Amino acid sequence: MKTQKLLQGINIYLIGMMGSGKSTIGKILAQRLDYRFFDTDILIERVTQQSINDIFVTQGETVFRDIETQVLSEVAACTRSVIATGGGIVLNSQNWSYLHHGLIIWLDVSIKLLKTRLINDTTRPLLKESDLTLKLKTLDEQRRNLYNKADLTIVINQNRTPESIVSEILEAIPTVIKPKVEANQFN
C-alpha cells in the first residue's frame, strides 16, 4: 500500500535534538509525500516577530515554551503536514497530546555529530555555555527518554544524505502504521 494512502492525511512530527536535521529532512519528506511543511521555530519567530534567541534573552525559556505549545496546538489542527519541532518540545507533557495525533519520528543523532554540526552556530540560545559537548550531553540526558516515546526512530550518522534518510523514513512508515480495514472488504 502506498505510504501516502496509509497515512490518510495524518501529520508527521519530527523530534530530536537541535542540529539533528529536522528542518532539512522535513522539507524533503513533505515534498515526497505532497504534504505541507512547517517548522515550529520559524512559526514562533513569525508570530512574535522576534528571533528565538531574543525571546530567550528578553522573556526567558518558560515564555518561549508557552509560545511553542500555542504554535504546536495551531499547527496540529492542520492535516497533511510534516512538522519540524524544536528540540525541547518533548519537555512539556501538554505537547504530547498534540504530537500523539500524528506520527512521531525521532531523528537520533550522536553527540559527536551534533557537536560537529553546531560548533559554529551562534543562533541557539541553549548553547551559550562554553563547553558544547557537556551541554549537548546534558540536554540529551534530559530528553532521551522522552524522544524514545516516538513511534519511529531513525538513527542518523555522518555518512547519510538527507535523501537517504527520507527514503528510510518512507520505507519504515508502513511498519508503524497499519492499514485500516474497510467494511466493504468483507462483502
Curated annotation (Swiss-Prot):
GO terms for molecular function: ATP binding; magnesium ion binding; shikimate kinase activity. One of its GO terms (cellular component) is cytosol. Binds 1 Mg(2+) ion per subunit. Keywords: Amino-acid biosynthesis, Aromatic amino acid biosynthesis, ATP-binding, Cytoplasm, Kinase, Magnesium, Metal-binding, Nucleotide-binding, Transferase. PROSITE patterns: SHIKIMATE_KINASE. Pathway: Metabolic intermediate biosynthesis; chorismate biosynthesis; chorismate from D-erythrose 4-phosphate and phosphoenolpyruvate: step 5/7. Mg(2+) binds at residue 23. Its EC number is 2.7.1.71. SUPFAM superfamilies: P-loop containing nucleoside triphosphate hydrolases. It is found in: Cytoplasm. InterPro entries: P-loop_NTPase, Shikimate/glucono_kinase, Shikimate_kinase/TSH1, Shikimate_kinase_CS. The keyword Transit peptide does not apply. Its cofactor is Mg(2+). The keyword Oxidoreductase does not apply. It catalyses: shikimate + ATP = 3-phosphoshikimate + ADP + H(+). GO terms for biological process: amino acid biosynthetic process; aromatic amino acid family biosynthetic process; chorismate biosynthetic process. Gene3D superfamilies: P-loop containing nucleotide triphosphate hydrolases (3.40.50.300). ATP binds at residues 19-24, 124, 160. Substrate binds at residues 41, 65, 87, 143. Belongs to the shikimate kinase family. Monomer. HAMAP family: Shikimate_kinase. This is Shikimate kinase.
